[in-house]
Amino acid sequence: MSSEIEKLFTFVEKLVDSDARKVFEALYEAGEELSEADIATKTGLKLNVVRRALNSMAEKGLVVYRRQKHPQKNKLVFYWRINYEGLPSIIESRKRAAHEKLRTLLEKEESVHYYVCPRDGTRYTFEEALDHEFICPRCGSMLVLDEERELRIQILKQYIKMLEDELGGAKAS
């Protein structure tokens, strides 16, 4: 299995959950529409779990369905497939949202100085540290200036650049 497909499965799992990933994998491997019962059989998941995963993925635009009346049972059967047409825009919008969150985090990281507890690693803004007289309210240790600030800023910048490159250089605003 290619790394791109594995990334897509991981994306589905993070966006929804592990059951949705199994359902998505079953749809991908089938390469065609599947009924809910067929998906349950292929994944080993209960039918209600399959339906919940499918509905969650449908809300996010990852899968689509069509209804068809069953000829003998006189009930509706839902046939599901991956929404290949919509996936690129869904992934791009998630990347844009992540880009915006990272930009906000970077701005905060660059503008605020943090103090950290050397014992438990809890971070406090200068104002919070001042309120506690530079003593950790949890353990009583002396708070020290966060020395990893520059490293965190550098990492955030790298992730932001990576997302901007993937988004075609267009900066999300």
From Swiss-Prot:
Residues 4-88 form the HTH TFE/IIEalpha-type domain. One of its GO terms (molecular function) is DNA binding. Pfam families: TFIIE_alpha (PF02002). One of its GO terms (biological process) is transcription initiation at RNA polymerase II promoter. SUPFAM superfamilies: Winged helix' DNA-binding domain. The keyword Cytoplasm does not apply. Keywords: DNA-binding, Transcription, Transcription regulation. SMART domains: TFIIE. Transcription factor that plays a role in the activation of archaeal genes transcribed by RNA polymerase. Facilitates transcription initiation by enhancing TATA-box recognition by TATA-box-binding protein (Tbp), and transcription factor B (Tfb) and RNA polymerase recruitment. Not absolutely required for transcription in vitro, but particularly important in cases where Tbp or Tfb function is not optimal. It dynamically alters the nucleic acid-binding properties of RNA polymerases by stabilizing the initiation complex and destabilizing elongation complexes. Monomer. Interaction with RNA polymerase subunits RpoF and RpoE is necessary for Tfe stimulatory transcription activity. Able to interact with Tbp and RNA polymerase in the absence of DNA promoter. Interacts both with the preinitiation and elongation complexes. The winged helix domain is involved in binding to DNA in the preinitiation complex. Belongs to the TFE family. This is Transcription factor E. It comes from Hyperthermus butylicus (strain DSM 5456 / JCM 9403 / PLM1-5). The gene is tfe.
